Amino acid sequence: MNTVDATVGGVTVPVDTGFIVHNPLNFPNIVALFRTLGVATEDSDMSFAVSARGGAFEYAGGLGPAGIFAQPANLLSPRFWGMLGNILRFNARARGALALPDDVSFGAWLDREGFTGAVRDDHLLPMAAAIWSASTGSILSFPASSLFRFLDAHGLLGVFGRPQWRTVSGGCRSYVSALIRDFGGRVHIGAPVATVTRHGDRTALELGTGDVREYDAVVMATHADRTLAMLRDADDGERDVLNAFRYAPNRAVLHRDPAFMPRRRRAWASWNYVTGASGGYVTYWMNRLQNIEAVDNLFVTLDPPEEPREVLAAFDYEHPQFDADAVGAQKRLGGIQGRNRAWFCGAWCGYGFHEDGLKSAMRVARDFGVTAPWETEPPA
């Protein structure tokens, strides 16, 4: 979560550069949390566009026929019509492959099933790369079944029945403020933990300042690799699980440069995957995603190949890469929870999204006999 105040021409609007959208079907606990906190949300839009090879090939899904045929030449393109037909074939084949072994990668499955050319390079890989903020190369190593289950759960293996997406009114900092407001404990700001060491019946946290504080137990809600780096006395089981997760760095740039959007204005969507000589990147059109009208042309681009004009802010993030090792480690996570007064949670415990982080935290809370106000059954 990271909400930025963007000021343009004397007008300031909140813009999210991390967690942006959710929906009731796939984020039920996030929705329940927002409802409990009284956080207002509003409809969003999850249209998706591809601008390939410097704008030589463009289309947008979710904008109706005008978006699909934003490039009129596509009407007469056998390659384009073949891609559309292969998308339907992919959806059907993927729904039948939800139980594949984890060692079958997405790339190997695509090759085996004959998904090449336009459907692979101009739709499937850009879509998956945009969802997971990953390179198309790393997407090919994802376990196919895990990817298919995610797409199926989010209605992305069908043409109809997709959920209505929502965004937090006023930016996601609204719910963070509400959480802190209602929190009965103490929140320590600017107190980074350097190391965690367990001894006897106590757990010592050494802060970056050198101060040491002792507690009965610790819940580590950080990236898996950072958790392992802090946990100085990790045992073999903890090391086995936490060391299985790799992270890819991403630079998110908030800017106003339309050169990082599709070349044709009709193809502008909420999510835009753009490729050129320098590779591919994702640009989010924040005006459409967050219903921002007071300031136009607000974009967030991940890993732009060059510096955009009118940069308003930039941030460095890291996203987990869900290869076979990571997916396998998730299945072993339960075996190390609380074994030595340490519990682990975070979005890396699921698909890498906010709902996954919250569900993993709820599972940890239940180990302490605590349930969420809205919880009627254990989190899946």
PLM regions with names:
Residues M1-V21:
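Conserved N-terminal glycine-rich FAD pyrophosphate-binding loop of Rossmann-like flavoproteins
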Residues T3-V4, A60-A66, A267, G279-A380:
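Conserved flavin/dinucleotide-binding core of flavoenzymes
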Residues G10, G54, G208-G210:
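Glycine-centered tight beta-turn/hairpin loop motif at sheet-sheet or coil-to-beta transitions
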Residues V13, N23-A144, F148-R149:
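Mobile amphipathic helical/loop "lid" adjacent to a hydrophobic cofactor/ligand pocket
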Residues P14, E42, R186-G190, W343:
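General small-molecule cofactor/ligand-binding pocket signal
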Residues F19-T36, Y175-R186:
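N-terminal Rossmann-like dinucleotide/flavin-binding domain of flavoprotein oxidoreductases
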Residues R149-G208, R213:
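Helical element adjacent to the flavin cofactor pocket in flavoenzyme catalytic cores
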Residues A191-P320:
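Mid-domain catalytic core of redox enzymes
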